[in-house]
Amino acid sequence: MTNHETTTESGIVFDRRQLIAGASAVGLGAAFASMPAMAQGTPKKGGVLRLGMEGGSASDSLDPRTYADSIPIAYSLMFWNCLVEIDTKGNATPELAESWESKPGATEWIFNIRKGITFTSGKALDADDVIYSINLHRGETKSPAKGLLASVKEITKLSPNQIQITLSAGNADLPFILSDYHMIIVPNGTTDFSKPDGTGAFTLAEWQPGVRIVAKRKPGNYWKPGRANFDSVELRYIGDAAVRTQALITNQVDAINRVNPKTIDLLAKNKSIKISRSQGAGNRYAFVALTDMDPYKSRDVMLGLKHGIDRQTIIKNVFSGYATIGMDHTIGPLNKYYDKKQKAWPYDPDKAAFHFKKAGTSGPFELQVSEGAYTGATDSAVIFQESLKKAKANLDVKRVSGDGYWDNVWLKAPFCAVYWGNRPTADLQLSQTFVTGQTWNDTHYSNPKFDKLVVDARVELDEAKRMEMYAECQRLLHEEAGMVCFAIGDALDAGSTRLRGLEPHARYDMNDQRLAEKGWFA
């Protein structure tokens, strides 16, 4: 399998100067003409796709304002679509918006809504549906996507199939924002999401949160040529990596996500199984501390923890080398604005001890972890614990239940294990994670200088200056934030050799969580 090696910003389709000067519209052909899967033969209809996935819980909902992990993303894209889709290389391409353009300055955007598309109920898609769906994440809402739309000043209906979005400050990345998985398009006025009424390929047949979800293909031809080939899809929640792998080996499922790096080389020897590896596009694995709470208020405590973790040993022993060193922020090496000059904190027990002494504490620091957070979280924490001993510091690794981890531990525990998924732009990486007051700012990091840099970088036309701004953002997080991001993993999926469409992607695993829509059986 060819590794995914490059991506543009992760890859705005247009030159930023041309786009902000007034981009020409993007057409339908860009969306579907060059899918790598097409090279594997003509798509065939039929069959039941069985998925075994990690990344969900019993508290999962069909409400797009609640999505936070892989399984909700995957099932939402069975039923609904977004305005914009991200292709395998990381480019923004048309989905329900057939084209878009911006006026000079990128503060006014016009999106042309595709005609002839209907929801499951038979209602025709129109501008009112799009405006309502975007507004679900604006104003009084707990949606994690609220921060992404903070600069949206007004959304205006220009015609039944055209809207204008006016921003308070220019943002050339707006199409990428509208590809965010929270931004699915629902009928105007929808308040009950338990019975999905979408423009997607499938309808809901069965739903047991935390157990499984079953979807059936809609009758007739799907509006995307070559897609929606399976008769039905069964997605099972399988949180244990060993159980997922065994389910694939014994033909109980057709594809799995988040393959354990420790077993992938052995699994690849199975002639009935193929591996999909998206190098550097996987999760950002970290331990995060709330820096408005003691003892993590102390910058020296955080520097002690950052110098006191042996990242290379974790990557070697937990990820079997299928990862790169993390820089204590979420921007990865595939991103155009990744600061290649930045050096990772070396494992230096003496320097860690110096900072702990300066802070007046060497622990114990309680770190809450669970395999429910991610496979390898516990082993990573134990290695962290051992590496800190050489700095004369104590780490108390507290193992907690995986059930409800994201509701009960994340954003609440002072120090815990977390992972962050990939995002197609630097702005999306930084805005949701580190800007003051954001719902998912899981370190409570707050720095006005950083916040201003993020805003200013969105509209900066000079690429060299923009690079400098993002480099400074990374430097600040590297030195100040409460994130100890020790590894950026490769996205590792595995599936049956008869399955087509399980390809590397620049953003998420399982072909951007669209395998149900994109795949077929040979």
Language-model regions, residue ranges each:
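N-terminal secretory signal peptides
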Residues: 1-14, 25-30
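Detector for C-terminal structural segments
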Residues: 14, 26-27, 69, 208-212, ...
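Alpha-helical secondary-structure segments
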Residues: 50, 126-133, 160-166, 200-201, ...
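N-terminal lobe/hinge region of extracytoplasmic solute-binding protein
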Residues: 52-104, 135, 197-199
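Gly/Pro-rich hinge or "lid" segments in bacterial periplasmic/extracellular proteins
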Residues: 87-91, 178-228, 232-234, 240-242, ...
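Aromatic- and charge-enriched surface segment that lines or borders ligand/interaction sites
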Residues: 98-143, 158, 164, 247, ...
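Surface-exposed binding/hinge segments that line
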Residues: 112, 146-188, 206-208
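Ligand-site clamp/hinge motif
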Residues: 220-266, 385-386, 394
